[in-house]
């Protein structure tokens, strides 16, 4: 366990909580989804460490055990935080694994910082290329009315919102694909977030356009997604990301919800570890 400090101009230091398995293995940085924390990777960290990798997780600003500043929730700043992590820990030859919202930092990283530190990347149930349906993004899977409803729901009641959100997160066609205990763990992680951060990041992942970032991905890439994902539907996200990154690999986890890392950890870990070994 450690903390790194992200610096953004004068008096803008933000401490980020980091967990690092250490060791001399090639580093894998796991970037969590909204509105969870690095603890959401507990089905992955031991398996990846056992396979010989140095596994680094961190809590995004505003979430988990990290500082919760009032500002800094654009993808440019969030990606700057990721870059600070890589430079502070002096990580090279890194695989970035971005789950859901975390795929945004992965996409934006190439545009801002290039690929010098990177070995490969994984877009896992990830939000790129662009969630919000607009006139010039007709394939966006998120309707503006849906986004407004989410914002209103979280603003009104965190308890009610996270109860419904985690149910959808882990369900396929109304059937929960994890245990109730696992769903409750996700609710507990969500409640560690600051509401202002959760709302700001909701806007960021819904409205940020990554279509110009994806062609900059210049290392091997894997897209892995559940075909029963009702939160970030595959056809409007993972399928398009795979098409936008020449040479990318695609693995669809059949019958899997958005929260596939918890519902289908054996298959998910096997596929990602096979990709990491390349």
What does each model-identified segment do?
Residues 10-71, 85:
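Conserved HGGG/HGGXW glycine-rich cap/lid loop of the alpha/beta-hydrolase fold
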Residues 32-34, 94, 98-100:
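Conserved alpha/beta-hydrolase "nucleophile elbow" surrounding the catalytic nucleophile
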Residues 77-94:
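Conserved acidic catalytic loop of the alpha/beta-hydrolase fold
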Residues 107, 111-112, 116-156:
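Flexible "cap/lid" loop of the alpha/beta hydrolase fold
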Residues 132-141, 152-215:
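Conserved alpha/beta-hydrolase catalytic His-Asp/Glu region
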Residues 217, 223-225:
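Short beta-strand/loop motif that positions the catalytic acidic residue
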Residues 227-232:
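Acidic catalytic loop of the alpha/beta-hydrolase fold
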Residues 246-278:
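Catalytic active-site module of serine/aspartate enzymes centered on a nucleophile-bearing elbow/loop
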């Amino acid at each position: 366990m450690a903390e790194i400090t992200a610096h953004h101009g004068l008096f803008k230091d933000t401490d980020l909580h980091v967990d690092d398995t250490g060791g001399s293995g090639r580093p894998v940085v796991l970037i969590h989804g909204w509105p969870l924390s690095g603890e959401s990777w507990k089905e992955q960290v031991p398996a990846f460490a056992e396979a010989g990798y140095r596994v680094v997780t961190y809590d995004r600003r505003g979430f988990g055990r990290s500082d919760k500043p009032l500002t800094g929730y654009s993808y440019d700043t969030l990606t700057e935080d990721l870059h600070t992590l890589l430079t502070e820990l002096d990580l090279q030859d890194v695989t970035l694994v971005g789950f859901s919202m975390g795929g945004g930092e992965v996409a934006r990283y190439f545009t801002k910082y290039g690929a010098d530190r990177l070995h490969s990347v994984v877009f896992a149930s990830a939000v790129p290329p662009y969630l919000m349906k607009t006139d010039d993004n007709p394939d966006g899977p998120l309707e503006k009315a849906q986004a407004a409803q989410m914002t209103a729901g979280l603003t009104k009641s965190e308890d009610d919102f996270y109860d419904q959100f985690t149910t959808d997160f882990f369900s396929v066609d109304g059937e929960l694909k994890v245990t109730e205990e696992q769903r409750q763990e996700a609710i507990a992680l969500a409640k560690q977030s600051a509401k202002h951060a959760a709302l700001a990041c909701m806007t960021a992942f819904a409205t940020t356009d990554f279509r110009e970032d994806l062609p900059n991905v210049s290392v091997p890439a894997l897209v892995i997604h559940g075909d029963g994902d009702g939160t970030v539907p595959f056809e409007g996200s993972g399928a398009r990301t795979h098409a936008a990154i020449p040479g990318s690999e695609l693995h669809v986890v059949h019958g899997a919800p958005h929260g596939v890392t918890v519902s289908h950890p054996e298959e998910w870990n096997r596929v990602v570890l096979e990709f990491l070994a390349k």
